Amino acid sequence: MSLNRREFIKTNAVAAAAATAGMSLPAAALAQAGSPPLQVRWDKAPCRFCGTGCSVLVGVQNDRVVATQGDPEAPVNRGLNCIKGYFLSKIMYGADRLTRPMLRKKNGAYDKNGEFTPISWDEAFDIMAQKWKQALAAGGPDAIAMFGSGQWTIWEGYAASKLYKAGFRSNNLDPNARHCMASAVVGFMRTFGIDEPMGCYDDIEHADAFVLWGSNMAEMHPILWSRITDRRLTHAGSEVHVLSTFEHRSFELADNGMIFVPQTDLAILNYLCNYLIQNGRVNREFVEQHVNFKVGATDIGYGLRPNDPREQSATSNGYPGADGKPKGDPGAATPATFEEFAAFVSTYTLDYTARLSGVPAEKLQRMAELYADPDKKIVSFWTMGFNQHARGTWVNNMIYNVHLLTGKISQPGCGPFSLTGQPSACGTAREVGTFAHRLPADMVVGNPAHRKIAEELWQLPEGTIPAKVGLHAVAQSRALKDGKLKCYWTSTTNNMQAGPNINDEIYPGWRNPEAFVVVSDPYPTVSALSADLILPTAMWVEKEGAYGNAERRTQFWRQQVRAPGESRSDLWQYLEFAKRFKIEEVWPAELLDKKPEYRGKTLYDVLYANGVVNRYPLADVGVVNKHAIDGYMNDESQHFGFYVQKGLFEEYAQFGRGHAHDLADFDLYHRARGLRWPVVDGKETLWRFREGYDPYVKQGEGVRFYGNKDGKANIFALPYQPPAEVPDQDYDLWLCTGRVLEHWHTGSMTRRVPELHRAVPEAVLFMHPDDAKERGLQRGMQCKIASRRGEVFASLETRGRNKPPRGLVYMPFFDEGRLVNKLTLDATCPLSKETDFKKCAVKVQKA
């Protein structure tokens, strides 16, 4: 690459700016400031990291990503990136990138305790098929399972769901989004009868105030935080309220920062409702027209194993009782009146709530006045503080209570907004339905009508999809440990580091001699190194993909470069693996008798070469994408001989079109910077459920929550309850886990970026200085953190970005050398089955 004098000066200016910021940029990225580098091709793609859905421009030179930059045409991020986004060009080029399948072998044959040995894809699929067939023959569909991801592309998740739920006839498929978004899903479904936020990011520029509940947006959603910051600093009267169990960077902008005792957010939400009612600030007209009241089941347990005393004493956890029958239903609810709801929340007075939560009364009252003010437009944001909660579904329902009582919902600048942590937790896990109980477009396996729709669209005989809900994430780990699962395939996730209670419930199952565990991953993660077979996987722009972000925006990208060595995409893996099974090997004879024409065919033939998925010819790949890359082709389509991604997407889209989950035509997404569904007549929807914005709300209806048959939303009466585990004299501190700005989740990508690793090389334990002093600890000292389940060692930090109150410590989970999830409890919300990573009891002492 040659530069003229002017370009050389620009390059040096950019390099100097980067050095000042502590960044090093690829040479090609420094070629010019304000214009693309020479000989570099640029194309759009959504960011690989969080659920915000920023768009970036990807610079490619000689089949290598050499630079990325914020996409100035992107409505989400408007040309900005966070620190992780600036280094996207480096995530695929770690020195230890896997390029060949690796099987544990001893003396030339598979051995559970053998050493990882490179093998061919044929050998990998041969042993996988052998193990899966043995498991299916001996234990049926219940003996196999898959753990997927909110980082799957839309068509990867859809193909995996077809393979398991239709092909293997097993609903034992669950995503790692179970650990982060399941409570939001169940909360939406219980209140509105339909999933995902009713608003969009445009709410930020319309709102007067923002309330953060268990969300450190400054670090976890920094681009959205920049938009909130701009609104706060430029809009007169704008306010930011932040609630958390510890102080973090979002508090720097807060007008009203509140630190509460873990789990008492339940009481605070009820106090807000009580305040609205007692002070006559309920929007009675809205409530009477659009709301029903219900009382939820309460003694629901904590999602622990059935033999745990906390579950044995619970009366409505759904577990088998002494008579073998389920003990109630944790999701049950009975109708109530407004007056009954008012009486229920009346005990949550200001004084009681302040004492219980530890939040000063004047701070609670200020927030209550904000919600009560009819002239204030408010957006409530939350993430894992709400969702990773033993009552996660409840707190989601309860924030909706507040917005429904005030009518501050489904209009510009007003609404409850659940943020996502993964790039396609919405688009893949939720919309495609890769949860153990779901099908696409909010359909569920337990509903016969929904199964019928899926079977017809997939051209399956009636009865193919089982009605039995499969194993959720935590249940999968327990089933592996108990020997009930024999074959397990995980992809695009790192549960051996990210899952709860690793020592007791995850590692023993993976190393169970009866289990065969496969991990698809680009890097040798903790999970990969604990498996029996590792499949090297293509990353991000090494394949054509699609993600769906937190505001219902579906975004596509084109393959930009080839994956290294023998790495293959997850999509390629699922379709190729399907070729190893004849229908007769996986379906019972009585089912096959209903479709005798399928005899002799493979699962690939029936699921993916079915005349629908394979109807778009290979030539379409170039035609659809000619506007961006002349002569474009992607590896999967080239291999299978048709436009695989388009065929899968268009079949999938049939589930939602006409059912308020409408997706646009495939080709349109490759031109757009994403579209927010429902997309009807080519027009996206910004605000749902309100006339004038939502095509599914008819003229004259005003507001209609059409997910429920009567068009009304539900307000739930739900109490404060303590968590499953609280500090005591032996384990005297609360532990909260989470992330940091510089790393994403378990760090399998970001820790391989030198600049990000140098910025935060290891996880530290954040502690209040007085708690440290009381224990004879000093900043920088190595300490031991122990719970009833395990122990880890980390350096102590008493300053910095996170400032816990006395009695609580905080530790991020990105560091594979300090596995904080050895400490956490595998308690879950009994409704959503999502893990509570935010509270357990630990003790800290000198190492």
UniProtKB/Swiss-Prot annotation:
Region (Disordered): 303-332
Claim: Acyltransferase is one of the keywords in the record: no
Pfam families the record matches: Molybdop_Fe4S4, Molybdopterin, Molydop_binding
The protein's required cofactors: [4Fe-4S] cluster; Mo-bis(molybdopterin guanine dinucleotide)
MF term (GO), any: electron transfer activity
Residues annotated to bind [4Fe-4S] cluster: C47, C50, C54, C82
Keywords carried by this UniProt record: 4Fe-4S, Electron transport, Iron, Iron-sulfur, Metal-binding, Molybdenum, Nitrate assimilation, Oxidoreductase, Periplasm, Signal, Transport
EC number: 1.9.6.1
GO cellular component assignments: membrane; nitrate reductase complex; periplasmic space
Domain of life: Bacteria
Every 4Fe-4S Mo/W bis-MGD-type domain range: 40-96
Primary site of residence: periplasm
Binding site for Mo-bis(molybdopterin guanine dinucleotide): 84, 151, 176, 180, 213-220, 244-248, 263-265, 384, 388, 494, 520-521, 543, 570, 737-746, 821, 838
Catalytic activity: 2 Fe(II)-[cytochrome] + nitrate + 2 H(+) = 2 Fe(III)-[cytochrome] + nitrite + H2O
Single GO BP term: Mo-molybdopterin cofactor biosynthetic process
Binding site for substrate: F813
Compartment(s) of residence: Periplasm
HAMAP family in the cross-refs: Nitrate_reduct_NapA (MF_01630)
Physiological role: Catalytic subunit of the periplasmic nitrate reductase complex NapAB. Receives electrons from NapB and catalyzes the reduction of nitrate to nitrite.
Oligomer and partners: Component of the periplasmic nitrate reductase NapAB complex composed of NapA and NapB.
Matching NCBIfam families: NAPA (TIGR01706), PRK13532.1 (NF010055)
Family per record: Belongs to the prokaryotic molybdopterin-containing oxidoreductase family. NasA/NapA/NarB subfamily.
The protein's name: Periplasmic nitrate reductase
Encoding gene (name): napA
